[in-house]
Amino acid sequence: MSYYFKNLKPDLNSDVEEDDGNLLESIMANKSKREIDEQESSDDELKTLSFGSLKKAETVIDEEDFKDTKPVHKKPITTTYREESFDEDEDSEDQSDEDAGFFEEDSEDETHHGQKVPKKKSKHAPVEQSSKKRVPRVRNIPGLEIPRNKRSNLYQDIRFDKSTGKALDSSIIRKRYQFLDEYREKEIDELQKLLQERKFLSKIDQGEREEMEQRLKSMKSRLQSMKNKDLEREILKEYENDMNKNNNTRYHLKKSEKRKVVQKWKFDHMKAKQREKVMERKRKKRLGKEFKQFEFHNRR
């Protein structure tokens, strides 16, 4: 290389450096102009927007910021462990230890997947029954159950059961089973004879004797009440037949009229002493009512 090229040094005021400086200045000037134009255009666009649209945009931005800043609460995952069954063979134990072990972890979401939490039902809610369930052959029909206060230890005859669907007519039943009165009278006579025997009374204690006397008394009253009902039924039947002899349409008495007819018949067929007792009882009853109506008995 020649001596001229070795001693050659770049000049600071050369033309190349001047061109580069001019380019940089022009680029920076263009950039500043572009930024100013963009700011002016954005200001012009904001001026054209209405206050309602600006308010909506502000609310949307606030909601997005609130969602971003809201803390996320993670549910704690509880793990349940299920023990697996294992065989007695050593090979199966080795395989189970290598694969999964004796315990497996199940998350709460997997165990309760697809199951709804049952809500507590009210005690006043109606009874629910599945339509897929078969109806049982033997069912409890409402109205046929005997209430507890009317239950007895006696045997219930199915001929008088409500499930037959027939109305119970006491007169018809009484005619069918009137022959039982003979057996009842025999039982009463036997009890009376037993209570009159001294040997029998010496063998039993006082409690058993009182129980037998009470039983005899109840049997007599029951039989007498049945006979009184039969008599009243016959009296009313005769009276209605006499009343409806010449009538085309049959006339039936009311309950109050029936009671008066029965009382009149009994009074007519009483003895003299019985009539006097009845009249005296009625007189005392009437005097008691009049005595209660006096002024000095009224409360002030």
Swiss-Prot record:
CC per GO annotation: 90S preribosome; nucleolus; nucleoplasm; small-subunit processome
Biased composition (Basic residues): 114-124
Keyword rRNA processing among record annotations: yes
Keywords: Coiled coil, Nucleus, Phosphoprotein, Ribonucleoprotein, Ribosome biogenesis, rRNA processing
Major location (coarse): nucleus
Ranges of compositional bias, category Acidic residues: 85-109
Subcellular location: Nucleus, Nucleolus
Coiled-coil intervals: 184-248
Region described as Disordered: 33-151
Pfam families given in the database record: RRP36 (PF06102)
Gene Ontology biological process: maturation of SSU-rRNA; maturation of SSU-rRNA from tricistronic rRNA transcript (SSU-rRNA, 5.8S rRNA, LSU-rRNA); ribosomal small subunit biogenesis; rRNA processing
Modified residues (Phosphoserine): S14, S41, S42
Alphabetical list of InterPro entries matching this protein: RRP36 (IPR009292)
Family from the record: Belongs to the RRP36 family.
Protein function: Component of the 90S pre-ribosome involved in the maturation of rRNAs. Required for early cleavages of the pre-RNAs in the 40S ribosomal subunit maturation pathway.
Assembly description: Associates with 90S and pre-40S pre-ribosomal particles. Interacts with CKA1, CKA2, CKB1, CKB2, PWP2, UTP15, UTP17 and UTP22.
Protein name per Swiss-Prot or TrEMBL: rRNA biogenesis protein RRP36
Source species of the chain: Saccharomyces cerevisiae (strain ATCC 204508 / S288c) (Baker's yeast)
Gene name of the encoded protein: RRP36
